[in-house]
Amino acid sequence: MSEVRSETGPGARVAVVTGGATGIGRAVCQALAAKGMRVGVVYNSSEAAARSVADGLPGAFVARADLGDPAQVEALVKQLQEVAGRVDVLVNNAGYNRDAPIFSMKIDDYDAVAGLARGTWYLTKLVLRRFMLRSGGRIVNISSVVGHTGNVGQIPYTMAKAGLDAMTRSLAQEMQGRDILVNSVAPGFIDTDMTAGLPDEVRTRILERIPLGRMGRPEEVAEVVAFLATAASYVTGSVIHVNGGMYGG
């Protein structure tokens, strides 16, 4: 379902953010709205949170989709066209993980993570067709530092995030000659609901690995995304790390 919350001026650029209801996604929605964009907040299970984001942003709307289901991805793109009439920026932020060491990991757990990665690829493919009709667009993929460093108990997740950065590089080359820019932002450990639940000893070990000595804020990631979605006219195929110096690429 999609719902228009209000109307913006004619010709407003439209940004669609998957996983836009909480954490980094929420901050990205707010940052893009601050740049004058109309934002589509895409969620799967956090309807109340998605509506709270949209309610605070001019012209924002919400849409629900399980990206692991190709039929729902197709329905989402149709909804976006009906509600907004255009998409100028796609931020692939939705992420999913099931932590377990390899011998405890079930095939269903792996498939759930891989299914979301496939859905991100499929959504990107469908939105790209709209971009090509409009002769331009911006894609920003939210990957992760662990896609580069690895992390215990997160093999499917690290594979998915590393693959997302590989997709960024390959797709940027495929879009040669078109005004379609594709980049990744790879956050480190960011203060979100996910990291808030870490045990104190784990949090301490993480902070010891970060030269800046603290976790990042969602807004710090969102500002980089907003730059790539707006002013970055000569950046494509890049992975930009936002991790406090934990990893340099």
Located regions from the model:
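Residue(s) in the substrate-gating loop at a strand-loop-helix junction
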Residues: S144
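Substrate-binding pocket helix/loop in short-chain dehydrogenase/reductase
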Residues: P101-I102, D108-D111, I206
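Alpha-helical segment proximal to the catalytic Tyr-Lys
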Residues: R129, Q173-G177
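Conserved glycine-rich cofactor-binding loop
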Residues: A21-T22
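Active-site loop-to-helix junction immediately N-terminal to the catalytic Tyr of the SDR YXXXK motif
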Residues: M105, G150-T158, S170
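C-terminal substrate-recognition "lid" of short-chain dehydrogenase/reductases
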Residues: G136, R214-V242, Y247
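Active-site helix of classical SDR
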Residues: L116, T124, A160, T168
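Short, small/polar-rich loop/turn modules that mediate ligand/substrate recognition or access, typified
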Residues: Q176, L181, T236-G237
